[in-house]
From Swiss-Prot:
Protein known as: Uncharacterized protein C622.14
Keyword Transmembrane helix among UniProt keywords: no
Keywords tagged on the record: Cytoplasm, GTPase activation, Metal-binding, Zinc, Zinc-finger
Role noted for this protein: GTPase-activating protein for the ADP ribosylation factor family.
GO biological process, one term: COPI coating of Golgi vesicle
Organism, scientific name: Schizosaccharomyces pombe (strain 972 / ATCC 24843)
Residues annotated as domain Arf-GAP: 2-119
Main location: cytoplasm
Length: 321
């Protein structure tokens, strides 16, 4: 550390961090001419060297120019200069403070004095507030209508192809794909056919609604099974849980339930994917398959590809006895 720099650190105004008043700051921002603590120096580094060129007072080598910047600067001079702008005083974070016009004026003023030239304040247009910038940048972009039209055409094609298949044959033999209901008010005790046709039939009229309703039906089915397990197994026998044999029966029931849910999801997902492979991708090998794979995989494949349920019947529950 140079003698001049050592003398600057001994001045009373430089014995506290400029930003947080922590004692004995061991870091400095050359182009701002201020002494700062370790914590604040990390935030200053995040501003970039154009905004704040951070150096360690004891561990870094200093050039004569850098030391001179600290001489013409200093915490006291910086405070006097920056406090004239209400925006700097009102700023909440280090990033906000040193992205103000007054902070840029300080950098230019120090540079001019080190170069031995007169500093002239530059008039700048009023900058947009940081709050407005954040609000603008965080606005969710709207989805282009072209994308929606392309999706509608794609799913309409699926519905048209499926409607031409015979409904008296299974899908594996070229028959029509049946599946999820198409109405939110579907009676769970009635078939999908009696409640508006199959899932793929509805794609031709309202693709987005069909996909949404299909997943809602599946979700309600799973939810109903969970309620059945709770009503049939858990609630009636809660007082018997201390019996080892009873606990074993409970765990076997839960394992079977979990396996059934997973297998149901896998079958439904496989059926839909098979239809796409047979009718869309086979006709147009150049079709952008990844886009629709991602859209269709999102709810179904997550369940179908999940790991097997843990066998709770093998767990040791003695600690609850």
């Amino acid at each position: 550390m140079s003698y001049k720099l050592d003398q600057l650190t001994r001045l009373p105004e430089n014995k506290k961090c400029f930003d947080c008043d922590a004692p004995n700051p061991q870091w400095a921002s050359c182009n701002l001419g201020i002494f700062i603590c370790l914590d604040c120096s990390g935030q200053h580094r995040g501003l970039g060297v154009e905004k704040s060129f951070v150096r360690s007072i004891t561990m870094d080598n200093w050039s004569e120019r850098q030391v001179k910047m600290m001489e013409v600067g200093g915490n006291s001079n910086a405070k006097t200069f920056l406090s004239t702008d209400p925006m700097f005083s009102a700023a909440g974070s280090i990033r906000e403070k040193y992205n103000t016009d007054i902070a840029e004026d300080l950098r230019q003023k120090i540079r001019a004095e080190v170069d031995g030239v007169e500093w002239v304040k530059v008039d700048r247009p009023k900058s947009v507030s940081s709050h407005a910038s954040v609000t603008s940048s965080s606005t969710v972009p709207t989805i282009p209508s072209v994308s929606k039209e392309a999706n509608d055409k794609y799913f309409a094609k699926l519905g048209s192809i499926n409607s031409q298949r015979p409904d008296d044959l299974p899908p594996s033999q070229g028959g029509r794909y049946q599946g999820f209901g198409s109405s939110n008010s579907v009676n769970p005790n009635s078939s999908a056919r009696n409640n508006g046709g199959s899932f793929l039939d509805q794609l031709s009229s309202n693709p987005v609604s069909a996909l949404s309703h299909g997943w809602n039906m599946f979700s309600r089915s799973v939810s109903q099974q969970i309620q059945d397990v709770n009503k049939s197994y858990i609630q009636p026998g809660i007082t018997k849980v201390q019996d080892p044999e009873t606990r074993k029966d409970y765990m076997n029931a839960i394992n079977n339930f979990s396996s059934n849910v997973q297998e149901g999801a896998k079958q439904s997902f496989t059926q839909l994917k098979s239809f796409l492979d047979e009718n869309v991708y086979s006709e147009n090998p150049q079709n952008t398959r990844g886009t629709y794979d991602a859209e269709i995989d999102s709810p179904y494949s997550a369940l179908a590809a999940s790991p097997p349920p843990e066998d709770y019947s093998k767990k040791n529950f003695d600690k609850h006895d």
